[in-house]
Amino acid sequence: MSYSLYLAFVCLNLLAQRMCIQGNQFNVEVSRSDKLSLPGFENLTAGYNKFLRPNFGGDPVRIALTLDIASISSISESNMDYTATIYLRQRWTDPRLVFEGNKSFTLDARLVEFLWVPDTYIVESKKSFLHEVTVGNRLIRLFSNGTVLYALRITTTVTCNMDLSKYPMDTQTCKLQLESWGYDGNDVEFSWLRGNDSVRGLENLRLAQYTIQQYFTLVTVSQQETGNYTRLVLQFELRRNVLYFILETYVPSTFLVVLSWVSFWISLESVPARTCIGVTTVLSMTTLMIGSRTSLPNTNCFIKAIDVYLGICFSFVFGALLEYAVAHYSSLQQMAVKDRGPAKDSEEVNITNIINSSISSFKRKISFASIEISGDNVNYSDLTMKASDKFKFVFREKIGRIIDYFTIQNPSNVDRYSKLLFPLIFMLANVFYWAYYMYF
């Protein structure tokens, strides 16, 4: 029994050794096949100097770029910038990395540290960062002809100079510009790989307040003190969606103006009611004007379209309050005139009687025969009105007529005319406002 167990143990041991030998032979064959197909990175980079660009001292390196716009997360009018996440892909040819075969191989992103890569940066960028979750979002791919593909995922905040004079019916033009930091046009030449088709993703973006109308790519030359640099420009137009602002600002302000007209149908004697409506609408309009400016920069160089409309609405609301003040004051003046009417009539009768009695007594005392008229003793200036007194008399008469012309004879007509004029003028102001800012 023990002898049979011993033989079984020996057989199992020999079988295990045989299997190990076959496994080692298989691994050797696999490693040999890998060495035949994969370029040895150590062999490729032997004598490779990552601090020198390809074709150093010769023709410039031609770098072709493509962009994928993943998102535009925010567009800030107060800071005049936008934040975007992009996939930046750069392609160039490095003759030092040529290997046999017709395959391409993706390398670990950490091997980028051993290769030359272009020093591309984003012009007018306020801040940018490379995503690192779960690893650095970079890709390096080598082709057998020496072509290198280098891809990055970047989030950047870029300046966008905005003209807010037509806000919120405005269209903004923003740019994303790429350029080499240190290599001028003699060392590096940038180009778009497929023209406008080099940029993708913008047509699929959905923004909260904007619609992307169009975009196009440009290649320009930036002239600086250190040389001329090739610059790639992506320019896109953003048209603001005005519907949001119509519901948030324009409709409430219009309703406040219409509410202020309600006082025209209230009696002049209802002082508390009309005063309350006027003051409430003025204060509400002021609050709406202040709230509309909280999210915008303090721009002193231009007046925005929304400020113009709110100013128009505030003028009508305040005008309705002044209209009641004028109508009420005219009503009080008319009542005062009516109260003074009987007293004034009796006063005029007394004055007439006194004048008539004085004239009759004066006629009895004066005898025209006793008056000796002598040319040397008569002062004609005493017998005629002076020119200055005549001018004052005529001027006072004219002023009195003008005052009587503008004096409101019937205060109830003020409300009657206001019911027609205020809505008519407000509608005309809206027609001119929307026609100007929408089509000019």
From Swiss-Prot:
<dbReference type="InterPro" id="IPR018000">
    <property type="entry name" value="Neurotransmitter_ion_chnl_CS"/>
</dbReference>
<dbReference type="InterPro" id="IPR006202">
    <property type="entry name" value="Neur_chan_lig-bd"/>
</dbReference>
<feature type="transmembrane region" description="Helical">
    <location>
        <begin position="302"/>
        <end position="322"/>
    </location>
</feature>
<comment type="function">
    <text>Pi subunit of the heteropentameric ligand-gated chloride channel gated by gamma-aminobutyric acid (GABA). GABA-gated chloride channels, also named GABA(A) receptors (GABAAR), consist of five subunits arranged around a central pore and contain GABA active binding site(s) located at the alpha and beta subunit interfaces. When activated by GABA, GABAARs selectively allow the flow of chloride anions across the cell membrane down their electrochemical gradient. Pi-containing GABAARs are mostly located in peripheral tissues.</text>
</comment>
<keyword id="KW-0406">Ion transport</keyword>
<dbReference type="InterPro" id="IPR006201">
    <property type="entry name" value="Neur_channel"/>
</dbReference>
<dbReference type="GO" id="GO:0005886">
    <property type="term" value="C:plasma membrane"/>
</dbReference>
<keyword id="KW-0868">Chloride</keyword>
<keyword id="KW-0407">Ion channel</keyword>
<keyword id="KW-0812">Transmembrane</keyword>
<dbReference type="Pfam" id="PF02931">
    <property type="entry name" value="Neur_chan_LBD"/>
</dbReference>
<feature type="glycosylation site" description="N-linked (GlcNAc...) asparagine">
    <location>
        <position position="102"/>
    </location>
</feature>
<dbReference type="GO" id="GO:1902711">
    <property type="term" value="C:GABA-A receptor complex"/>
</dbReference>
<dbReference type="GO" id="GO:0034707">
    <property type="term" value="C:chloride channel complex"/>
</dbReference>
<dbReference type="InterPro" id="IPR006028">
    <property type="entry name" value="GABAA/Glycine_rcpt"/>
</dbReference>
<feature type="transmembrane region" description="Helical">
    <location>
        <begin position="242"/>
        <end position="262"/>
    </location>
</feature>
<keyword id="KW-0813">Transport</keyword>
<feature type="transmembrane region" description="Helical">
    <location>
        <begin position="271"/>
        <end position="290"/>
    </location>
</feature>
<feature type="topological domain" description="Extracellular">
    <location>
        <begin position="24"/>
        <end position="241"/>
    </location>
</feature>
<keyword id="KW-1133">Transmembrane helix</keyword>
<feature type="glycosylation site" description="N-linked (GlcNAc...) asparagine">
    <location>
        <position position="43"/>
    </location>
</feature>
<dbReference type="InterPro" id="IPR047032">
    <property type="entry name" value="GABAAR_pi_TM"/>
</dbReference>
<feature type="topological domain" description="Extracellular">
    <location>
        <begin position="291"/>
        <end position="301"/>
    </location>
</feature>
<feature type="topological domain" description="Cytoplasmic">
    <location>
        <begin position="323"/>
        <end position="419"/>
    </location>
</feature>
<keyword id="KW-0472">Membrane</keyword>
<keyword id="KW-0325">Glycoprotein</keyword>
<feature type="topological domain" description="Cytoplasmic">
    <location>
        <begin position="263"/>
        <end position="270"/>
    </location>
</feature>
<comment type="similarity">
    <text>Belongs to the ligand-gated ion channel (TC 1.A.9) family. Gamma-aminobutyric acid receptor (TC 1.A.9.5) subfamily. GABRP sub-subfamily.</text>
</comment>
<protein>
    <recommendedName>
        <fullName>Gamma-aminobutyric acid receptor subunit pi</fullName>
    </recommendedName>
</protein>
<feature type="glycosylation site" description="N-linked (GlcNAc...) asparagine">
    <location>
        <position position="228"/>
    </location>
</feature>
<feature type="disulfide bond">
    <location>
        <begin position="160"/>
        <end position="174"/>
    </location>
</feature>
<dbReference type="InterPro" id="IPR008100">
    <property type="entry name" value="GABAAp_rcpt"/>
</dbReference>
<dbReference type="GO" id="GO:0016324">
    <property type="term" value="C:apical plasma membrane"/>
</dbReference>
<dbReference type="GO" id="GO:0022851">
    <property type="term" value="F:GABA-gated chloride ion channel activity"/>
</dbReference>
<feature type="signal peptide">
    <location>
        <begin position="1"/>
        <end position="23"/>
    </location>
</feature>
<comment type="subunit">
    <text>Heteropentamer, formed by a combination of alpha (GABRA1-6), beta (GABRB1-3), gamma (GABRG1-3), delta (GABRD), epsilon (GABRE), rho (GABRR1-3), pi (GABRP) and theta (GABRQ) chains, each subunit exhibiting distinct physiological and pharmacological properties.</text>
</comment>
<keyword id="KW-1003">Cell membrane</keyword>
<dbReference type="InterPro" id="IPR036734">
    <property type="entry name" value="Neur_chan_lig-bd_sf"/>
</dbReference>
<feature type="transmembrane region" description="Helical">
    <location>
        <begin position="420"/>
        <end position="440"/>
    </location>
</feature>
<feature type="glycosylation site" description="N-linked (GlcNAc...) asparagine">
    <location>
        <position position="145"/>
    </location>
</feature>
<feature type="glycosylation site" description="N-linked (GlcNAc...) asparagine">
    <location>
        <position position="196"/>
    </location>
</feature>
<dbReference type="GO" id="GO:0004890">
    <property type="term" value="F:GABA-A receptor activity"/>
</dbReference>
